[in-house]
Each structure stands twice: as structure tokens, then as C-alpha cells.
Amino acid sequence: MLNINIENEYSRLKTVILGIADNLGNPPSESDAFDPRSLYHIKNNSYPLEEDLKKEVESFKKKLTKHNVEVLRPNNVNDCNQIFARDLGFVVSNMFFLSNIVPNRQDEIEGIKEILNHLNVGVIKLPEFMHIEGGDIIVHNDKVFIGTYSEEDYPSLITARTNNESIDYLKRIITVSYTHLRAHET
């Protein structure tokens, strides 16, 4: 069983789930792009090649293991981009929260199920209407910073991935203080 406990983002890392770059499938079409940066690279024929991504991820793995970090890897899901494992869930204290990620990325969850089954705690699955991604969470001792988007057009934006309902839910479960981060208005 895996013991988990995250009190902040900068203490010594002991174990991490690192994404993989195997069997990504074809680059997405413009209409399937998840975010503006991917769309830019698709339009400019500069979308990363699988072989380059594999080298990058493996180089990162070597650095982690050199520093005695246990590296866990998702099981391969064919034709699925599994690079950004951080988005799939997050840990606060000794609780693992499984993200409700955008529908286009649901297959990625399959790749980490075996790892989740080996955790020494239950996995908390957020209710379906609550959206949150692990990359939007920063744990800082007795505080949790959550990046979110709360404008009325939230449902129409694929890049707005954490909503206010998820923040309210986390406030009820985790006994730490929260800081709601908003984009700077220019």
C-alpha cells in the first residue's frame, strides 16, 4: 500500500505519478484542441512529436530517480495523451481527490486506476457537477490555493476547468484555509 501525505508543494518529494508519452495517437485536430497553446502548435505544424515527448519524460524520470523519488507510471491507454498526470487528481494532507476532468480526457483516468487501488486511503471522487483539475491546486501547509474561473460563460470554455462548486465542496471536507485566485483584469 502507498502512504500519501502532502502538506505543501515544496517539501522533499518522495513519490510521484509521472505521465507517459506512449501511443499518443495522431495529433489532435484544431477542433479537438484542449487549450490555446495546443491550438497554436496544431495550426503551425509544431505540435510535439511522440518520440521527442518520450525523451523529455524519460529524462525527467531519470532526474527524479537520481534524487531518490519513487516514480509511478500510468498504464498505457492506446491513442491517449497521458503526459499531464497532475491534472487527474491531487492530494491534500492524506486525501486523494480524483478530478472531474473535461470529457475529452476521461480515458486518462483508466491509466492510473491501478495506482489508485494501492493507496492506503480512499479516493474521493467529486460529484459530477464539480469540476477541478489537479494543476489548479497548490497546497501550502494550512492553506490551499485554487485557481478557478467563475464568469457566466464558464460552461462554454474548455480551458475553464475548475468551478466554484468544487471550492465550496473542498471547504466542507478539508479543514484548511483557502485562497480563491482570480485572473488579473487588464
Spans of model-derived segments:
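The feature marks the mature, well-folded catalytic cores of soluble enzymes
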Residues: 1-182
